[in-house]
């Protein structure tokens, strides 16, 4: 049987656990993703959106607008000229928001160790899940979404909003 926290601060017993679980369930099962494909990993992300992998069963819907997205999926090489635009897209997303870094180039800069390449998306925006590989298979991306769902279910409903960083 689940344990419930009872809050007597208002004078009446109020059960808080049920509301947290309901909000966590809703957030984890309706992930609206901003697909942000920058290189060859985007091809695998497009394949993941097809009927063979059926991401709809996880409640994942791909959106073109950051204002309608909770999850940003960065797939591919991020150049330094593009970093400010990426940060602006991240800032336009409503809270709470999560980021998945997909592929070796997004995770660490990949084989492009040059002056023009950002050596990891986490230098620009906070990343929640890293998907390794060059290019990672849609199954790996699917597994990353399942890990993100588990992470969301463990968070408090009243998650603190991180302060905005300047680029």
Swiss-Prot record:
Pfam families: Oxidored_q6 (PF01058)
Cellular component per GO, a single term: plasma membrane
Enzyme class: translocase
A Gene Ontology BP annotation from the UniProt entry: aerobic respiration
Cofactor: [4Fe-4S] cluster
Chain residues that bind [4Fe-4S] cluster: 40-41, 105, 134
EC number: 7.1.1.-
Quaternary state and interactors: NDH-1 is composed of 14 different subunits. Subunits NuoB, C, D, E, F, and G constitute the peripheral sector of the complex.
HAMAP family: NDH1_NuoB (MF_01356)
Protein name per Swiss-Prot or TrEMBL: NADH-quinone oxidoreductase subunit B
Organism: Campylobacter jejuni subsp. doylei (strain ATCC BAA-1458 / RM4099 / 269.97)
Gene encoding the protein: nuoB
